[in-house]
């Protein structure tokens, strides 16, 4: 479309009123003016900017001026869109796009040339919204999106370097519609979730926009498919599952309940009824800093510009205002087996997920302990991965403690060695900035990754070592390209956890100490 076509944009029914270019800020209108759009952008991409906020009813592209006009079905939808994009600059094809209200109250493009593509794109979107057509890129397991597609998404998070809580998922996905229920779990050594929308169309938009995107810079990649389930059955509201329509549900066995402020936020009138909580007038539960970061090229803004500070890159995540990541680094660990557990054992186990500074087993209740991590994010990671795992015949429970630090016993105070300070331990896995250990954080599994193996140690030596520790070895293999590393598969996850506690840092001779961690692979 050449520049002369801008003369054909009319407003308020006055065919003599022509658009003259940029105007000062004006009152809300359902017609939005977009500036600095890429010259090669498609009509569908521009329309996608408005999809999360409501129906797009008209579009006019002024490619020669790198501008466009987008008409929403209602002024309310346009206001929601402007409110969202004011602090979060949208991007098209990696280029920032600027949006403001137009002086026009509606777009009249009937008699304009070169509008066929825009109208075709609008008709396609309208068909999707009415359930009669599939969106490009939104497919089911069979490869096509059928009418009546499930409102439930299956989400897998790869490269889980930093904690992704249920609240973080709610914050991200609620940009595309009302999230009714979320269930999180670990399967095939991967953190996964099932998320149910109120409307299948919202699930389609979310999948289009978020599949393949990173939650944080260069990590926590979202892989999204439609679930075969059409509804989720949530029995408990806790840190692993949530029914946002039933805040009266119990928390379940030993699970932390929803904090009152969080429950009030998710259950407040107007939030569940609004599909875009956080976009207009609602301060989201997780307030990510509005700074340079990630963008979504198609339907933007869901992830927001999440930014990790330099401390986060070294494994100490700092997201100012992120109430979804509590600021406490001390965990309360309960339901331990007092006959077997020691401060050193807890240090080794929790040290898989962060640097443990102090451990205190309760003097009068030895099945309980406090574990102080280096920071809140490491505490969250450890809690997410270890709570619910079996250890020495009992199901370990980990929650955030009310204590801000583990106090060392006073001089002369009876302690029986139940409190230990590990803050200067050489066994910390994450003390080096940029350590590869940040890339190898996986849930407990029956397969262990072994490293730092000296050349003289054979497969039989290692199998015997684990057998003598009470494990049943199911399989073993050295890495083909690096014989210093191996995988060993044991009889159960519980066996593997106990073997890791006992054999990590085991002296193999020749100044080599065995390094043990959980593997994402199987043999």
From Swiss-Prot:
Covalent cross-link Glycyl lysine isopeptide (Lys-Gly) (interchain with G-Cter in SUMO2), where: 36, 187
Family matches, as SUPFAM superfamilies: RNA-binding domain, RBD
Key words of the record: Acetylation, Differentiation, Erythrocyte maturation, Isopeptide bond, mRNA processing, mRNA splicing, Phosphoprotein, Repeat, Repressor, RNA-binding, Ubl conjugation
Modified residues (N6-acetyllysine): 394
Phosphoserine modifications at: 425
Tissue-level expression: Detected specifically in spleen, thymus, lungs, and bone marrow.
Modification type Phosphotyrosine: residues: 98
Ranges where the record places region Disordered: 1-25, 406-426
UniProt keyword Membrane present: no
Modified residues (Phosphothreonine): 109
Xref: InterPro entries: HnRNP-L/PTB, Nucleotide-bd_a/b_plait_sf, PTBP1-like_RRM2, RBD_domain_sf, ROD1_RRM1, RRM_dom
Cellular component terms per the entry's GO annotation: nucleus
Gene Ontology BP terms: erythrocyte maturation; mRNA processing; negative regulation of mRNA splicing, via spliceosome; negative regulation of RNA splicing; regulation of cell differentiation; regulation of RNA splicing; RNA splicing
Pfam family, one: RRM_1
Signal peptide extent: none
Annotated ranges, domain RRM: 30-114, 153-229, 329-403, 446-521
Keyword Flavoprotein appears in the UniProt entry: no
Binding partners and assembly: Interacts with THBS4 (via the acidic amphipathic C-terminus).
The protein's name: Polypyrimidine tract-binding protein 3
């Amino acid at each position: 479309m050449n520049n002369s076509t801008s003369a054909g944009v009319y407003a308020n029914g006055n065919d003599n009123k022509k658009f003259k270019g940029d105007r000062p800020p004006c009152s809300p209108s359902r017609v939005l003016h977009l500036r600095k759009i890429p010259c090669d952008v498609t009509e569908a991409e521009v329309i996608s900017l408005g999809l999360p906020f409501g129906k797009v009813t008209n579009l006019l592209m002024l490619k020669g001026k790198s501008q466009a006009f987008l008409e929403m079905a209602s002024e309310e939808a346009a206001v929601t869109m402007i409110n969202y994009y004011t602090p979060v600059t949208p991007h098209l094809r990696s280029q920032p796009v600027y949006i403001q209200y137009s002086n026009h109250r509606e777009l009249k493009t009937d008699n304009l040339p070169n509008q066929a593509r825009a109208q075709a794109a609008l008709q396609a979107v309208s068909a999707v919204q009415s359930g009669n057509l599939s969106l490009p890129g939104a497919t089911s397991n069979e490869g096509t999106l059928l009418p009546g597609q499930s409102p439930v998404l299956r989400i897998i998070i790869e490269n889980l370097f930093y904690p992704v809580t249920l609240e973080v998922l709610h914050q991200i996905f609620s940009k595309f519609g009302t999230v009714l229920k979320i269930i999180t779990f670990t399967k095939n050594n991967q953190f996964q979730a099932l998320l149910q929308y109120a409307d299948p169309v919202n699930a389609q938009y979310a999948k289009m926009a978020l599949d393949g995107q990173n939650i944080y810079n260069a990590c926590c990649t979202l892989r999204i498919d439609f679930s075969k389930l059409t509804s989720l059955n949530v029995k408990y509201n806790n840190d692993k599952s949530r029914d946002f329509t039933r805040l009266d549900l119990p928390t379940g066995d030993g699970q932390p309940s929803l904090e009152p402020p969080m429950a009030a936020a998710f259950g407040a009138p107007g939030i569940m009824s609004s599909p875009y909580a956080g976009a207009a007038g609602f301060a989201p539960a997780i307030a990510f800093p509005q700074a340079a970061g990630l963008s979504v090229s198609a339907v933007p803004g869901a992830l927001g510009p999440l930014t990790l500070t330099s401390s986060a890159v070294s494994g100490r995540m700092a997201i100012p205002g992120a109430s979804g990541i509590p600021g406490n680094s001390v965990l309360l660990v309960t339901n331990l087996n007092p006959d077997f557990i020691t401060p050193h054992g807890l240090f080794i186990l929790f040290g898989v997920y962060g640097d443990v500074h102090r451990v205190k087993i309760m003097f009068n209740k030895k099945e309980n302990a406090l574990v102080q991590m280096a920071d809140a994010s490491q505490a969250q990671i450890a809690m997410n991965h270890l709570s619910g795992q079996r250890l020495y015949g009992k199901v370990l429970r980990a929650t955030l403690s009310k204590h801000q630090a583990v106090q060392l016993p006073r001089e002369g105070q009876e302690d029986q060695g139940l409190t230990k300070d590990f803050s200067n331990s050489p066994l910390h896995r994450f003390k080096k900035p940029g350590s590869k250990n940040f890339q190898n954080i996986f849930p407990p599994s029956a397969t262990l990754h072994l490293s730092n193996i000296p050349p003289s140690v054979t497969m039989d030596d290692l199998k015997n070592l684990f057998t003598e520790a009470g494990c049943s070895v199911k399989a073993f293999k050295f890495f083909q390209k690096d014989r210093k590393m191996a995988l060993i598969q044991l009889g159960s996850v519980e066996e593997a956890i106990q073997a890791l506690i006992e054999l990590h840092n085991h002296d193999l001779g020749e100044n080599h100490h065995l390094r043990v961690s959980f593997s994402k692979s199987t043999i």
